[in-house]
Amino acid sequence: ILFRDITTLIKDEKAFAETIEQIIKKSKKYKIDKIAAIESRGFVFASAVSYLLKKPFIMLRKKNKLPADTYSVDFELEYGTATIEVHKDSIEKNDSVLIIDDLIATGGTAEAAAKLVDISGGKVAAFIFVINLFDLGGSNN
């Protein structure tokens, strides 16, 4: 299990602002209707980007954390299995969704997020990750 500490990045306002600006710059290559993020550290980056781009922010949360009807996807982690969910009314048919997360490792969580968008009727416009653990190959998937 590999964890990366993002607190040093987000506590430095200049570094955090530059990170958000770089995400926005990359996101402008795509047609985006909504921005989704994976709980919880993806929320830090995606909420700022959503605010600045004036796009709806969709939370992809751990199992049983959302109050309304949800779609669910189970996926494998390095240390077991997990489930992420999205509200059924969050993504509409043919919505183009940018998925943002703090990190990509094996790609399992990103793949599950893409399945949630697909199940909801949307399409993944792109993924943007702040950190890529190249040795684990997730960005190749």
Language model: regions and residue ranges:
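PRPP-associated nucleotide enzymes
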Residues: I1-N141
